[in-house]
Design a protein with these regions (language model features):
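Single conserved hydrophobic/aromatic residue that forms the stacking wall/gate
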Residues: 1-10, 280-289
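Helicase motor core with emphasis on the C-terminal RecA-like subdomain
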Residues: 4, 8-176
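Proline-rich low-complexity regions
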Residues: 12-13, 126, 250, 283-285
């Protein structure tokens, strides 16, 4: 047989490019004060199904794992602080359905091909969209409908900021190069945070981040399925600014709001804002009582 040169191979090769859009995945962001309560609700919705909960630190993995275990849930855990043997055993328990739920840091998932993961919960917001897409994308690899839920709180931003600002241990980079890396990480964190606040289609935001076009309404994310009422607050903003200016910027936001609402609070009366501020709204007879 005559051996073919590399040129022949290159001529015959086909490059297959797949997009970022996976229409079977439902995306949702929930702003949560009590994240464990949200997790329990989600687990009830996905009872008997396989899922992953991603946490930002090993400590949180342990806390969430213990809380779920105490509630009688078949759960296992994975992070870099465990021994190789324990990580392998826990990974196998999840893959072979001996435990339906995995609580893990981002150390879990590389090279794992479990097609029937029905939900991925992010207990914390990741540091960038790349990490979120990769981790959320471990749901629904069999093409069946699956959910990707992000539980957001402001503390997530501060935690990620701390990690970014303290990531200065790379001796191969100069100080200038290190600052450039950190600046890019800050920008990526900002884009990730915007994802948690946008009222637009979450899928459109994600695809736009990765440079892919989207139609603007996917019908399979929390924003597209939520009815939002747009309210013009410019009038109220102007009134508030006028009140601040009239008070010569002497008082905090609470006192300004109390003045605009006609409150007879201790500060309003002490500063005689009820008498001297033109924007003070007199309370109704019912309010006085």
């Amino acid at each position: 047989l005559r051996s073919r040169g590399l040129g022949d191979v290159y001529k015959r090769q086909h490059i297959v490019t797949t997009g970022f859009d996976r229409s079977n995945l439902y995306f949702e962001v929930r702003t949560a004060k009590d994240k464990m309560a949200q997790v329990m609700r989600l687990l009830q919705e996905h009872e008997g199904e396989s899922g992953i909960i991603y946490c930002i630190t090993r400590k949180l993995v342990e806390e969430v794992y213990e809380a779920l275990k105490a509630r009688g849930i078949a759960v296992t855990k994975y992070h870099a602080g465990l021994s190789d043997e324990e990580r392998r055993m826990n990974q196998d328990d999840f893959i072979y359905d001996r435990c339906s739920l995995m609580v893990a840091t981002n150390a879990f998932g590389m090279g794992i091909d479990k097609p029937d993961v029905r939900f991925v919960i992010h207990y914390n917001m990741p540091k960038n969209m790349e990490s979120y897409y990769q981790e959320a994308g471990r749901a629904g690899r069999d093409g069946e409908p699956s959910s990707c839920i992000l539980l957001y709180s402001g503390q997530d931003v501060r935690t990620n900021q701390f990690f970014i600002e303290n990531n200065r241990e790379n001796e191969e980079l100069s100080e200038t190069e290190l600052e450039e890396v950190i600046a890019k990480d800050r920008e990526r964190l900002k884009k990730m945070t915007y994802y948690c606040y946008t009222k637009d289609c979450l899928r459109e935001y994600m695809l736009g981040y990765f440079g892919e076009p989207a139609k603007g309404y996917c019908g399979n994310c929390s924003n597209c399925l939520q009815n939002y009422e747009e309210v013009d607050v410019s009038k109220y903003a102007r009134i508030m600014l006028c009140c601040i200016e009239e008070c010569r910027e002497r008082y905090g936001v609470t006192t300004i709001l109390e003045t605009l609402h006609g409150s007879r609070s201790e500060k309003v009366l002490r500063y005689r804002l009820n008498e001297n501020c033109l924007l003070y709204t007199s309370p109704s007879p019912r309010d006085r009582s």
